[in-house]
From Swiss-Prot:
Encoding gene per record: guaA
Protein name, entry field: GMP synthase [glutamine-hydrolyzing]
Residues covered by the Glutamine amidotransferase type-1 domain: 25-215
GO cellular component: cytosol
Domain GMPS ATP-PPase: 216-408
Coiled coil: none
Length: 533
């Protein structure tokens, strides 16, 4: 589908476009739900491209995506609140399929002339979904009944003209609705794991109703990215920050594949790395990547900048700013450098901005997107900014990166600075490195390294009294953090065996003399974040 050329201010005119050489997409409008990004993940898992955009995004901003359908996310608002977000009118004018989820369903109802009312019986948690009709394209192959996850206080009192109730729950007579124009609404969340058959509904919408093809692969993404990188860079020169993690490794490999020796990689030792991190990283890159690499020892520079800084947000800003200064300095030494490459991922972008929906609060600045000073002289190139972590790993595999690089656990850009609560000092860094080395060694020995998303130690600013032999001690408290996750947007604490935790704790208090107490963090995300700072 294309938008016809039009005079300024005229209504958009939609034209069917069956050219399959154009990449198809599903466009998801974000109304502020904590699950919005999860919808995008579910669509991507089907090998169909999608993007999450603000609910008020104009057509001109998404026309290039060649949308085959629209999804309206859930959200915390009520359609009758002053300033409540609504769907753009063009989605209904486009004649393309629309699926509203929770608040998205209520927005459809309200905008198309139905009635939404506050429900006396709110539904939060599990419910059983029962079909109201014999056949439905949206509910095809759904078990009867099917458990779903409800989270709403408003309900549909009267459907818009032409709509039919397709399914119900005990407290929700219109749990699913639809019309002949392929506009549908769900009063539950099919994207969450608590709706075990929700993927069936999403697949029905994407393939049977929107007629998408499962042709978005990492191989295609590589070719498209190479083309885009060459177009963006031209004859320019690029420097890429190597961190040792999979994100920067994939970025470097992808850009090198596109422009070869126009890329120079810079590995900065900022003094915030784990034990043996620098040596291991340089070894892997020199032996497997075959790129130009510059090693920069900036330990004193970073630690001096962090002196006296205790606020976690300020730490991130200081580190991000100092990184840019280092790269600018190195760029001057190299001559004319035009671009800085970064491994920014989709969740980084979503979590760092106030929201694509303007309805969610900023959680924390990401080191790749929040710490950049306004005066930065280098232009950014971020070829992974629309990918999830698991997609980056698949991309790395497609690019031929070694498994030891692809399957490394994520390590934050600010490094150990945000795993030390309070001021970062050389003494605290050595304590944390020793404790973290023990955690990682024992996790690997127990063959659980690839079963958890991240595992690490945190050096708190708490000290407590202990006894070692016949002597009183007053040492630091170290926390152990291990989580399971798919994409870092949500995470659950890992149920590590007690015996393993016991070994880790005993080793830390015996081998790291400044520590006399170890605790295990059993918080999930949300409400906690994975990192403590």
């Amino acid at each position: 589908m294309e938008i016809a050329k039009e005079k300024s201010g005229a209504k958009p005119e939609f034209i069917d476009n069956e050219d399959e050489s154009l990449r198809e997409s599903i466009v998801i409008f974000d109304f502020g739900s904590q699950y919005s990004l999860l919808i995008a993940r579910r669509i991507r898992e089907m090998h169909v491209y999608c993007e999450l955009v603000s609910h008020d995004t104009p057509w001109e901003k998404i026309a290039h995506l060649n949308p085959r359908g629209f999804i309206l996310s859930g959200g915390p608002s009520s359609v009758y609140e002053a300033g409540a977000p609504l769907a753009p009118a063009y989605i209904f004018e486009s004649k393309l399929p629309v699926l509203g989820i929770c608040y998205g369903m209520q927005a459809i109802t309200h905008q198309l002339g139905g009635v939404v009312e506050h429900s006396e019986k709110r539904e939060y948690g599990h419910a059983l979904l029962h079909s109201s009709v014999a056949n439905s394209d949206l509910l095809s192959d759904m078990p009867e009944p099917s458990p779903v996850w409800m989270s709403h206080g408003d309900r549909i009192e009267k459907m818009p003209a032409g709509f039919t109730a397709l399914a119900y729950t005990e407290n929700c007579p219109v749990a699913v609705m639809g019309n002949e124009a392929d506009i549908y609404g769900l009063q539950f969340h099919p994207e969450v794991v608590h709706s075990p058959n929700g993927k069936i509904i999403l697949k029905n919408f994407v393939f049977n109703i929107c007629k998408c093809h499962a042709n978005w692969t990492m191989g295609n993404y590589i070719q498209e990215s190479i083309h885009n990188i060459r177009e963006q860079v031209g004859d320019g020169q690029v420097i890429c920050a190597l961190s040792g993690g999979v994100d920067s490794a994939v970025v470097a490999s992808l850009i090198h594949k596109a422009i070869g020796d126009q890329l120079t990689c810079i590995y900065v030792n900022n003094g915030l790395l784990r034990r043996e991190e620098a040596d291991r990283t340089l070894h892997v890159f020199k032996n497997h990547m075959g790129m130009k690499i510059i090693y920069v020892d900036a330990v004193d520079r970073f630690l001096d900048s962090l002196s006296g800084v205790t606020d976690p947000e300020q730490k991130r800003k200081v580190i991000g700013s100092e990184f840019i200064k280092v790269f600018e300095d190195e760029a001057c030494k190299l001559g004319k450098i035009d671009f800085l490459a970064q491994g920014t991922l989709y969740p980084d972008v979503i979590e760092s901005v106030s929201s694509v929906s303007k309805a969610s609060a900023k959680i924390k600045s990401h080191h790749n997107v929040g710490g950049l000073p306004a005066h930065m002289k280098l232009k950014l190139i971020e070829p992974l900014r629309y990918l999830f972590k698991d997609e980056v790993r698949l991309l790395g595999k497609e690019l031929g990166l070694p498994d030891e690089m692809i399957w490394r656990q994520p390590f934050p850009g600010p490094g150990l600075a945000i795993r030390i609560i309070g001021e970062v000092t050389r003494e605290k860094l050595e304590i944390l490195r020793a404790a973290d080395w023990i955690v990682m060694s024992e996790i690997k020995k127990a063959k659980m390294y690839h079963q958890v998303w991240q595992s690490f130690a945190i050096l708190t600013d708490v000290k407590s009294v202990g006894v070692m032999g016949d002597f009183r001690t007053y040492g630091y408290l170290v926390a152990i953090r291990a989580v399971t996750s798919e994409d870092a947007m949500t995470a659950d604490w890992a149920k590590l065996p007690y015996d393993l935790l016991s070994v880790i704790s005993n080793r830390i208090v015996n081998e790291v003399k400044e520590v006399n107490r170890v605790v295990y963090d059993i918080s999930s995300k949300p409400p906690s974040t994975i990192e403590w700072e």
